[in-house]
Each structure stands twice: as C-alpha cells, then as structure tokens.
Amino acid sequence: MSVDGAHGDDDDATQREIVRRAYASTAMNAGSCCATPALARVKIGYTPEEQRFVGSSDLGVGCGAPTSFANLKPGESVLDLGCGAGVDVFLAARKVRGTNGRRGRALGVDMTSAMLDRARARAREMTLDGVDVEFRLGELESLPVESSSVDVVVSNCVINLCSDKRAALREAFRALRPGGRLCVADVVSRGKELPPALKTNEALAC
C-alpha cells in the first residue's frame, strides 16, 4: 500500500471493518495467519526469555520486534499503535519500569475489542512493578491519547493496514513529546499501489 492511502470514506470504513474482523478472529482463535505463534516469535527476533515473559499475549501477528530497537529507558512513557493482545506493550513495560520514584508507563491502543480483552486478561496475570500499563480502544487515525504525552511510539506490522497512513503518522507525532522517538516494524510495498481486490481480500488482512 502507498503512504497516501487516499480513498473515500466508504472505502476506508470497509477496509477498517475487514481488518477488524480478521484480527477479532485471530484473537478468539489465538493463532497467527502467518505461522504458529512460537515459530513467528523466533522469526521476528524475540528472545526465548521474552517469549516466556509475554506468554499468551503474543499471537504471532507481528513482523518485527520494535522494542528491541527503541532504546527504551526506565521511567519513560511508551505508546504502542495497534497493540493487539499486548505483546510489545508488556515488553516495553518491563524496560521502562521506573526507578527513584519515577514510574514508567506503557499504553496500547487497538481498534479490536477482542484483542484488548486478551491484553487486559494477560495484564491481570502479570506482576509489573514500577510501571503503569493501560489499554485503550481506538483507531490510529484518531488516537484516544493526549498530545505531547509520550516519549516513544512503537508499532508492529499495523500501519500498513491503515487506509489513511498519513493521518496515522500525524497522530503518532501529535502524541509524542518534543524530542520523542518513533520505532516501527512494518511491511512496505515499493512501486505501484496495490489493486483494490487485494486491499479488500480478508485472507490478506492480517
């Protein structure tokens, strides 16, 4: 998909609903469309120890490990765009645990309620001292996040699914504090725009 993602409102809504259905199904079936979650984790760079830590929150739908490259520091605030079941939120939370009384913060936003249900359930099972973990329902093109409120924005194989990528990136930069950092793992189509038939193919929505 191109960066512009210029479509009509009806096309945007259709594409968004296709993606929502695909990921709701993944959340309920606890499986990746690309590989088994365990195999997918190995392929994209999570360490064995990280795999054990995140447990059932990783459904194998990412395409990288952005928290490995974001240079996260204790006490920072991190936002994960399209957090799914929370894998990168939990990994970020562990890295930004506060010290000397300053708490870290890890916030995930996703438009799929079923994914957020899994993320919140996993959060209740974990012990994460020195950091606040939160999940919010929302869309990347209109984030339910305050302006200039986070130090780092991460995203894992989600922005490519947005029909309006410019809006999603504008929102990411709106949420960042001055001097903040953006670390994204994603897939990019070089060259021509994808045909409409591929954009609306539910089998490719993951």
Name what the model sees in each region.
Residues V184-D186:
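Acidic carboxylate diad motif detector
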Residues A38-S77, L91, K95:
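Conserved alpha-helix/loop element of class I SAM-dependent methyltransferases that forms part
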Residues R97, R166-R181:
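A short glycine-rich, Lys/Arg-flanked "PGG" loop and its adjoining helix->strand segment in the class I
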Residues P74-S142:
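Class I SAM-dependent methyltransferase SAM/SAH-binding core
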Residues D151-D164:
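A short SAM/SAH-binding and catalytic strip from SAM-dependent methyltransferases
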Residues V188-C206:
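Short, glycine-/aromatic-enriched active-site segment of Class I SAM-dependent methyltransferases
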Residues S2-K43:
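N-terminal auxiliary segments of SAM/dcSAM-dependent transferases
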